[in-house]
UniProtKB/Swiss-Prot annotation:
This is Brevinin-Eu. Disulfide bonds join 18-24. Belongs to the frog skin active peptide (FSAP) family. Brevinin subfamily. The keyword Disulfide bond applies.
């Protein structure tokens, strides 16, 4: 199975963490 969902989830998680920690 192509890990497309995992890739998108990882990117979204990183973006959310960036916004939450305000280190963008």
């Amino acid at each position: 199975v192509i890990p497309f969902v995992a890739s998108v989830a990882a990117e979204m998680m990183q973006h959310i963490f960036c916004a939450a920690s305000r280190k963008c």
